[in-house]
Swiss-Prot record:
Pfam families: PBS_linker_poly, Phycobilisome
PANTHER family the UniProt entry points to: PHYCOBILIPROTEIN APCE (PTHR34011:SF6), PHYCOBILISOME 32.1 KDA LINKER POLYPEPTIDE, PHYCOCYANIN-ASSOCIATED, ROD 2-RELATED (PTHR34011)
Function: This protein is postulated to act both as terminal energy acceptor (by its phycobilin-like domains) and as a linker polypeptide (by its repeats and arms) that stabilizes the phycobilisome core architecture. Has intrinsic bilin lyase activity.
UniProt xrefs under Gene3D superfamilies: Phycobilisome linker domain, Phycocyanins
Subunit structure, as described in the record: Heterodimer of ApcF (a variant beta-allophycocyanin). Phycobilisomes of this organism are composed of a two cylinder core, from which six rods radiate. The core is mainly composed of allophycocyanin alpha and beta chains and of minor components.
One Gene Ontology cellular component: plasma membrane-derived thylakoid membrane
Gene designation: apcE
Gene Ontology molecular functions: lyase activity
Coiled-coil blocks: none
Annotated source species: Nostoc sp. (strain PCC 7120 / SAG 25.82 / UTEX 2576)
Keywords tagged on the record: Antenna complex, Bile pigment, Chromophore, Electron transport, Lyase, Membrane, Photosynthesis, Phycobilisome, Repeat, Thylakoid, Transport
Family statement drawn from the similarity comment of this UniProt entry: Belongs to the phycobilisome linker protein family.
GO biological process: photosynthesis
Name of the protein this chain belongs to: Phycobiliprotein ApcE
C-alpha cells in the first residue's frame, strides 16, 4: 500500500531520562502552580550539593579504568581483561607479576597478571594484590569466566558494558535522580545472560561499588551518595525485565500497539489525580483543578474566577463520582461555548476525544461513528458515548481524572501522529479546520498538487517578488509523501506537443503566441579575441539591447530595479559583446541585491524553489531535484546553486547563450490563479452571454393593469411580525433546571396577570404553588388554574368588571383568544351567573380546546395561526388594549365586515374626482389677473420664497483643504477661510485684531491641524465677546452649529444637550464636544475648513439652516445691537 497523505511530521523529542530539577519543575508546571515548600527545599538541597556531586563524578571518571579493571579481574581469569577495553589512550598502570620470573607478555598469556591502582601508595597496592575477599555476597552459581573460552568479541562487549554501568552511575549522581540508571539498566540481565553470566555481572557491579567507595573513605557524605546510586544500579540489574505497556483496541480498524517499559520510565512524570472520600479539602481541590485543566485546558478557577460550585460540592461529598463530574463538565454551558459552538462537528469530536479520553481519534471509522452520534443527539450524546465507553472505564474508571495519553505514556499511532501531537498543544482550540478526518480521507486520494516538501514552499506565481503563503495563519503543514521517482504535473506555456518530457528535442523552440514573449540578443557587434557564439549577428541596435537588459532584470528580480542597484559594468560588457546573456544572468543572480531579496530572508527550500523558477523557467519536479540542489546549497552555498542551474544541460538546450530565461511551465494552481482574475480576461475572446430573464422574475411579472384598491389590498395583506415572534414556554419532563422553571413561572404570571408580579411574590402569595411546580408535584395546567383561583385574579379581573368583560378577559388569559361568537358568550355567562368565577375558570382550563392546544405542560399563549379568520380582528383588538385602559367591552356584538373597496376608490368614481380637482386648479379667467397672480399656493404650483430670496446660499460652498506641499499663498487662503467661517466675517476682509498670529504661524509650520485651529478660534476671547456674552444660550448653540458644523440644530434634543453643556461647563466644553464629534470628523476631518452644508442637509433641517444663515450678527456698533448686554455670572 502506497501512502498518499500525511498529517504532518511533528518533531518528536522523547525524554531519555529525568533529572531532579527538571522533574520537579515539570510537575509544578503541569499542575499550573508555583513550587511548594518541600519542592523548593529539595531543589535547594540538590543545588547545595552540586559541587560535591561534580567532585564525585570527576574523581570516578579519572579512576574509571582502575575501577573497571578491579571488577573485570574479579570475574575473568586466564588472561588480562583490560587488554580488551576500548579506550582513547593507554593509562599509566603499575603491574606486578605474581609468579616472579617471566616477562609481561608471557604473564598475560598465562593469566598471572593483575592491575592495581596508581594512587594510595604502597599499602593500597598491597591491599589490591592480596585482597581476594569479595566486596559483597557472592550469588549462588557464580563461576569465574575464562577469557580464552569467552572470546575476544565477547570480552570487548563485557568490558564496554562495565564501563557503561560506571558511567550511568556518574550521570545519575550529577543529575540527582537515579532515573538514568533505571532506564538503562532494568531489563539488561536477560540480554546479558544470553552471552554471559548474570551472576558474574552482579559480582562485577559489587566490585565497582567497593572500588568506588574506596576513594571516599575520608568523606562520609560523598560515600553515602555513591553508595546510594550504586545500590540502585545493583538492584535494578537484579530486577526482572518489565513487561511492555500494551494498548489493546476493541475494534479491528484501530492499531494495537505496545510501548517498552523503559520509554515509559524515561518520559516525564504525569501525575494522575484520583478523587477519594478520605482526602483532605486541599487535596480534593487539587483534584478538581486537575479536572478543570483537562476538560477546559486551563484552570478556570484561577484564570477567570469561574467554577461550577454545585458540581464541586457534590463530587467532594461523594454524591457523584469523578466520572459523572467529568460528564457534567463536558455538558456545561461553558464547555459548549468554548469547544462546541465555534467549531464544526468534526473538530468538536477531535477536541472531545482530547478532553475526555486523552487522545485523538484513531481511524476514519471511529470518526464516522461518533459523527453520527453528535449529528443525531448533539454534544450531550457525544459526551455520554465517550464517558460510557469501555476505554474510559479501563483507563480512568470511576475516580481518576482523565489525562493526556501522549508520547511516553503509551504507544502512539503512526497514521494520526502529526494531528495527535498538534491536538495536545495549547493552541489546539485556535485551529478551526479538522485535522484527523482530513488526514484519514486524504489516504484514499491521489497525491495533492503541491510542493513535495509542503505547500508553503510554493510561491504565488505572479510577476512581482517572492510571496509565500503565511504559514502562521490557517497553517497547512501537511507534506505530500512524494517518492523519489514522482514528478509534479506542470503545464507547458506553449504548444502541448513541445512538452520537454515527451519531446526533449523541442526545448529550444519558442512558445509562439501561446506563451510569453521571448527576448533574444542577436545584435552583438562582434567578439574580441574569441570565436563568436552560434547564431550571433553583427547587427547592432542600442534600443533592442536595452530591451534585452530590461527583460533580464524583470525575469531575474521580478521587477525593475532602482538606478543605483543596476550592474552598469555588466550591462556595458553585454552591449559590447564581451559577455553573453547567460553570463549576465549569472552576474545578476550572484549580486548582493539578489542575495538580500531571495536568499537571506527565506529557508533554503523556498529559496531554491524561487531561484529555480526564475533562472530555469519552471518549478522543480520533485524530491530528487530538490535534494540535489539542497545538497549543493548546504555544502557550497548560493553561488554553487546558481552555477548548477545555469550550467545544466536543460538551460543550455532551452535558452543557450543569447536568450533571456522566460516562464516555460506553470503549476495548475498558478494557471487557475491567473485565469480567475478579472483583469486577465480578454474582451475580444470573452464568451458572449445571452441575457436571460430568470424564471422567478417572469413568474412575478404583473401582466394586467391593477387598480389602486387592488394594489393597496395586496400591500396590506398578512399579519404583523408578532405571529413569527411568538415564544412557547413548555416544561420538559424529567428536567429540574431551576432557571428554566423560574422563566416558565414568570411567563405564566405575564399571561394570566398581564404583568410581571414580582412585588406580590415578596408577600409569599404564590410561593406554595411555585414550590410544588418546581418539585414536580403539580403540572403547569394545575399551576395556571391555581393562579386563576387566587384572590389577586379575583380582585384585578373579576370584581371591577361586568360578566361580559370577565368572559373576554378569561378567554384571553386561559385560551389565548377572544370569544368566538355570541353563543360562547351566553354559555360562559350562564356559568358565571349560576356557579361563580371558579367554575368559569375550571370550565376554561378543563375544556377540550385547552387540552388540545396547551396540554398539561405548556403556558397559554396568543394563538395567531389557529384562530378563525372572523375572530382574528377581535383578538387583535383585545390584545392591543392595555389592562384597565377602559371598561369598554371589546365584543358587544359581531358586526358585519365592511367591503374592502370603498366607493370613492372605484375606477370610475376616482377618475371623476381627479377631473374635478384638475378643474379647480385652472385659473379663473373671469376674475382680474392680479387676483390670480397674488394668490398663495400650498400645493407646489407657486414659486417658493426660497427660490427668489437667498439663491446664492443654495449653491455649494467652496471647500478649503490644507494638504501637504501647498504654497504659502494657499495656506493664507485656508487661514482667511477659517476666520470668515468661524467669526462670521461678512465682507471677507478679516480685521487684524481678529487674527491670532501665534496660531497662524503654527498652522503654516504644520504644528497644528485645521481642526485644532478651529477649536482655538472658537474658544478665543474675540469669539466669546461676539457670540457668547451678548446672547442667550439657545442663540449661542445656534451660532456654534452654524460656524463649526455648517448647519442649524436639527432637533430639540440637540439644543437641550448643548444647553446643559453650556450651563454646566461653559463655552470651551461645548466647542470641544462639537469639534470632537463624529459628525465633524466625517465631514471635515483634520484638514478641511468647515463650510455651510445647505445643499446636502436633510429637508427637515434645510430651512432652519437657511434661516440661521440669514440672521446677521449684531455688532456692538450697529443700531440693531441690544441696548443692554446680559452678561453671565462668570466665564467657565
Amino acid at each position: 500500500m502506497s501512502v498518499k497523505a500525511s498529517g504532518g511530521s511533528s518533531v518528536a523529542r522523547p525524554q531519555l531520562y529525568q533529572t531532579l530539577a527538571v522533574a520537579t519543575i515539570t510537575q509544578a508546571e503541569q499542575q499550573d502552580r508555583f513550587l511548594g515548600r518541600g519542592e523548593l527545599d529539595e531543589l535547594a538541597s540538590y543545588f547545595a550539593s552540586g559541587a560535591k556531586r561534580l567532585e564525585i563524578a570527576q574523581l570516578l571518571t579519572e579512576n574509571s579504568e582502575i575501577i573497571v579493571s578491579r571488577a573485570a579481574n574479579r570475574i575473568f581469569v586466564g588472561g588480562s581483561p583490560m587488554a580488551f577495553l576500548e579506550k582513547p589512550r593507554e593509562p599509566e598502570l603499575a603491574m606486578a607479576a605474581v609468579g616472579g620470573g617471566g616477562d609481561v607478555r608471557e604473564s598475560m598469556k598465562l593469566g598471572t597478571v593483575t592491575y592495581v591502582e596508581t594512587r594510595g601508595g604502597f599499602l593500597e597496592n598491597l591491599r589490591s594484590i592480596f585482597n581476594t575477599s569479595p566486596s559483597g555476597p557472592t550469588p549462588p552459581g557464580f563461576r569465574p569466566i575464562n577469557i580464552a573460552r569467552y572470546g575476544p568479541s565477547n570480552m570487548a562487549k563485557s568490558l564496554r558494558d562495565l564501563s557503561w554501568f560506571l558511567r550511568y552511575a556518574t550521570y545519575a549522581i550529577v543529575a540527582g535522580d537515579p532515573n538514568i540508571i533505571v532506564v538503562n539498566t532494568r531489563g539488561l540481565r536477560e540480554i546479558i545472560e544470553n552471552a554471559c553470566s548474570g551472576e558474574a555481572t552482579i559480582v562485577a557491579l559489587q566490585e565497582i561499588k567497593a572500588a568506588s567507595l574506596s576513594y571516599f573513605r575520608k568523606d562520609p557524605e560523598a560515600a553515602e551518595i555513591v553508595s546510594q546510586y550504586m545500590d540502585v544500579l545493583i538492584t535494578e540489574f537484579k530486577a526482572p525485565t518489565p513487561s511492555n505497556k500494551l494498548r489493546q483496541r476493541p475494534s479491528g480498524d484501530q492499531q494495537g500497539l505496545q510501548l517498552p517499559q523503559i520509554y515509559f520510565s524515561a518520559a516525564e512524570r504525569r501525575p494522575k489525580f484520583v478523587m477519594k472520600t478520605g482526602l483532605s479539602a486541599t487535596e480534593k481541590n487539587e483534584v478538581i483543578k486537575a479536572a478543570y485543566r483537562q476538560i477546559f485546558e486551563r484552570d478556570i478557577t484561577r484564570a477567570y474566577s469561574l467554577s461550577i460550585s454545585d458540581l464541586e460540592s457534590k463530587v467532594k461529598n461523594g454524591d457523584i463520582s469523578m466520572k459523572e463530574f467529568v460528564r457534567r463538565l463536558a455538558k456545561s454551558p461553558l464547555y459548549q461555548k468554548q469547544f462546541y459552538q465555534p467549531f464544526i462537528n468534526s473538530r468538536v469530536i477531535e477536541l472531545a476525544f482530547r478532553h475526555i479520553l486523552g487522545r485523538g481519534p484513531s481511524s476514519r471509522e471511529e470518526v464516522q461513528k461518533y459523527f453520527s452520534i453528535i449529528s443525531n443527539g448533539g454534544l450531550p450524546a457525544l459526551v455520554d458515548a465517550l464517558v460510557d465507553s469501555a476505554e474510559y472505564s479501563d483507563y480512568f474508571g470511576e475516580e481518576t481524572v482523565p489525562y493526556l495519553r501522549g508520547l511516553g505514556q503509551e504507544a502512539q499511532e503512526c497514521r494520526n501522529w502529526g494531528p495527535q501531537q498538534d491536538l495536545f498543544n495549547y493552541s489546539a482550540p485556535f485551529r478551526k479546520v479538522p485535522q484527523f478526518i482530513t488526514t484519514f480521507a486524504a489516504y484514499d486520494r491521489p497525491l495533492p498538487d503541491q510542493h513535495p516538501y509542503g505547500s508553503g514552499n510554493d510561491p504565488l506565481e505572479i510577476q512581482f517578488g517572492a510571496i509565500f503563503p503565511k504559514e502562521t495563519r490557517n497553517p497547512s503543514t501537511s507534506p505530500a509523501p512524494f517518492g523519489k521517482d514522482t514528478r509534479r504535473i506542470l503545464i507547458h506555456q506553449g504548444p502541448g506537443i513541445n512538452n520537454q518530457v515527451s519531446n526533449p528535442s523541442a526545448r529550444g523552440l519558442a512558445p509562439g503566441s501561446l506563451g510569453p514573449k521571448v527576448f533574444k540578443l542577436d545584435q552583438l557587434p562582434g567578439t574580441i579575441g574569441k570565436k563568436a557564439a552560434k547564431g550571433a549577428s553583427v547587427k547592432f541596435s542600442e534600443s533592442s539591447t536595452q530591451a534585452v537588459i530590461k527583460a533580464t532584470y524583470l525575469q531575474v528580480f521580478g521587477r525593475d530595479v532602482y538606478e543605483g542597484q543596476r550592474l552598469k559594468v555588466q550591462e556595458i560588457k553585454l552591449e559590447n559583446g564581451e559577455i553573453s546573456v547567460r553570463d549576465f544572468v549569472r552576474a545578476l543572480a550572484k549580486s548582493d541585491l539578489f542575495r538580500k531579496l531571495y536568499w537571506t530572508p527565506f529557508y533554503v527550500c523556498k529559496a531554491i524553489e524561487y531561484i529555480h523558477r526564475r533562472l530555469l523557467g519552471r518549478p522543480t519536479y520533485g524530491r530528487q531535484e530538490n535534494n540535489k540542489y539542497f545538497d549543493i546549497a548546504s555544502k557550497k552555498g548560493l553561488y554553487a546553486v546558481v552555477d548548477a542551474i545555469l550550467d545544466s544541460l536543460e538551460y543550455t538546450e532551452t535558452f543557450g547563450e543569447d536568450t533571456v530565461p522566460y516562464e516555460r511551465y506553470l503549476t495548475p494552481a498558478g494557471v487557475a490563479l491567473r485565469q480567475l482574475r478579472v483583469g486577465t480576461i480578454r474582451e475580444d475572446v470573452a464568451n458572449v452571454e445571452k441575457q436571460e430573464t430568470p424564471r422567478f422574475v417572469e413568474l412575478g411579472t404583473v401582466k394586467e393593469n391593477r387598480t389602486q384598491p387592488d394594489i393597496d389590498f395586496r400591500i396590506n395583506q398578512g399579519v404583523t411580525k408578532q405571529r413569527e415572534q411568538t415564544k412557547v414556554f413548555k416544561r420538559v419532563a424529567g428536567i429540574k433546571d431551576k432557571a428554566a422553571i423560574k422563566t416558565l413561572i414568570s411567563a405564566a404570571y405575564r399571561q394570566i396577570f398581564e404583568r410581571d408580579i414580582a412585588p406580590y411574590i415578596a408577600q409569599n402569595e404564590f410561593s406554595g404553588w411555585e414550590s410544588k411546580l418546581g418539585n414536580g408535584e403539580i403540572t403547569v395546567k394545575e399551576f395556571i388554574e391555581g393562579l386563576g383561583y387566587s384572590n389577586l385574579y379575583l380582585k384585578e379581573f373579576y370584581t371591577p368588571y361586568p360578566n361580559t368583560k370577565v368572559i373576554e378577559l378569561g378567554t384571553k388569559h386561559f385560551l389565548g383568544r377572544a370569544p368566538i361568537d355570541q353563543a360562547e358568550i351566553r354559555k360562559y355567562n350562564q356559568i358565571l351567573a349560576t356557579q361563580g368565577i371558579r367554575a368559569f375558570i375550571n370550565a376554561l382550563v378543563n375544556s377540550q380546546e385547552y387540552n388540545e392546544v396547551f396540554g398539561e405542560d405548556t403556558v397559554p399563549y396568543r394563538r395567531f395561526p389557529t384562530l378563525p379568520a372572523a375572530n382574528f380582528p377581535n383578538t387583535q383588538k383585545l390584545y392591543n388594549q392595555l389592562t384597565k385602559q377602559n371598561n369598554d367591552v371589546v365584543i358587544p356584538s359581531f358586526k358585519p365586515v365592511q367591503a374592502r373597496i370603498q366607493s370613492d376608490k372605484t375606477p370610475i368614481l376616482a377618475k371623476a374626482i381627479a377631473d374635478l380637482a384638475a378643474q379647480a386648479k385652472q385659473m379663473d379667467k373671469s376674475k382680474p389677473l392680479f387676483i390670480e397672480l397674488g394668490r398663495s399656493y400650498n400645493d407646489g404650483r407657486g414659486q417658493s420664497v426660497e427660490v427668489g430670496v437667498g439663491t446664492t446660499r443654495r449653491k455649494p460652498a467652496r471647500i478649503y483643504r490644507l494638504t501637504n506641499g501647498i504654497g504659502q499663498a494657499e495656506k493664507q487662503l485656508v487661514i482667511n477661510a477659517i476666520y470668515r467661517q468661524v467669526l462670521d466675517v461678512f465682507s471677507g476682509q478679516v480685521p487684524d485684531y481678529y487674527r491670532r498670529t501665534e496660531l497662524d504661524s503654527k498652522l503654516r509650520n504644520g504644528e497644528i491641524s485645521v481642526r485644532e485651529f478651529v477649536r482655538e478660534i472658537a474658544s478665543s476671547e474675540i469669539y466669546r465677546k461676539r457670540f457668547y456674552t451678548p446672547y442667550p444660550n439657545t442663540k449661542v448653540i445656534e451660532f456654534l452649529f452654524r460656524h463649526l458644523l455648517g448647519r442649524a440644530p436639527a432637533t430639540q434634543g440637540e439644543i437641550r444637550q448643548y444647553n446643559k453643556l453650556l450651563a454646566d461647563n461653559g463655552l470651551r466644553a461645548a466647542v470641544e464636544a462639537i469639534v470632537d464629534s463624529p459628525e465633524y470628523s466625517r465631514y471635515f476631518g483634520e484638514d478641511v475648513v468647515p463650510y455651510p452644508r445647505f445643499p446636502s442637509l436633510p429637508a427637515g433641517n434645510y430651512l432652519g439652516s437657511v434661516q440661521a444663515a440669514a440672521d446677521l450678527v449684531k455688532q456692538s456698533w450697529s443700531s440693531l445691537s441690544p441696548s443692554t448686554l446680559t452678561g453671565r455670572p462668570g466665564d467657565r
